[in-house]
């Protein structure tokens, strides 16, 4: 998680289930007028979103921002591709990693920081099915241990 993150608006829980997150980056979002109002209202879905580097710029695809209800004719397209703002060195580093096989850029969450919408972008490797099963077993074991301690303290 980036330092000093503010109010979390939306999280991509599926990304943590489907990928190993190696690094995270904080990126600004280039938005149109009513998009920031819809984000502040929490009308964002990151479930199928992904990011790509194209011509030295990072773009996020399939991020759904619902139209703002009071936006009438000035509303935006909910699934348009949006530009992400990163430092040039970060973009060059991401280009190097994404050209390697198995790495992809996944949006992890959207949050507000000092009034601006920011996105936590993760550099991720895909998990295999057995990795997912192993993570589920570990999670269940931790839950059982916590339950046992809780029951023990009640006595």
Swiss-Prot record:
Similarity field: Belongs to the SmpB family.
The keyword RNA-binding is annotated on this UniProt entry: yes
Pfam family, any one: SmpB
Localization terms from the record: Cytoplasm
Function: Required for rescue of stalled ribosomes mediated by trans-translation. Binds to transfer-messenger RNA (tmRNA), required for stable association of tmRNA with ribosomes. tmRNA and SmpB together mimic tRNA shape, replacing the anticodon stem-loop with SmpB. tmRNA is encoded by the ssrA gene; the 2 termini fold to resemble tRNA(Ala) and it encodes a 'tag peptide', a short internal open reading frame. During trans-translation Ala-aminoacylated tmRNA acts like a tRNA, entering the A-site of stalled ribosomes, displacing the stalled mRNA.
A molecular function GO annotation: RNA binding
Entries under NCBIfam families matching the protein: PRK05422.1, smpB
UniProt keyword terms in alphabetical order: Cytoplasm, RNA-binding
Gene this chain is encoded by: smpB
Protein name in UniProt: SsrA-binding protein
Cellular component terms per the entry's GO annotation: cytosol
GO BP field: trans-translation
